[in-house]
Amino acid sequence: MKSDPTLLRWYRRINKEFFKGACPDSVCVRWADPDEGESRRWEKKYFGEASVSEEDERHDWQIVMSKPLNKMWMVRISTLVHEMIHLATRLKDDHGPKFETWRVLLGKRGIFKKHALRRGYTLF
């Protein structure tokens, strides 16, 4: 599998600036492929998914995002950050205390401040 270059650039920047490198480097960040069949039927319901990359020998992890639901930049980046938190916890904590700890830490590091990632935009 191949990462979307723009999504991967955002992933790397956010990982460096706000996660301080806590998210894995060996990750494929891509849009869902409508031809993937049943495993991606969620694309019209869910914004994204972080998982272990089982079909890809080049990457250990993957973030797959729904293109139809992530059209706006702010939604797209919010989804990416959400899925990155799952990777930072190594998928050990769905939306529990570890996830919340990361969300709070990212807030303290300024990710939710106006202009933190793009001029004129605020996440969440």
Where are these regions (language model features)?
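Active-site-proximal or metal-binding-adjacent scaffold patches in catalytic folds
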Residues: 1-78, 87-124
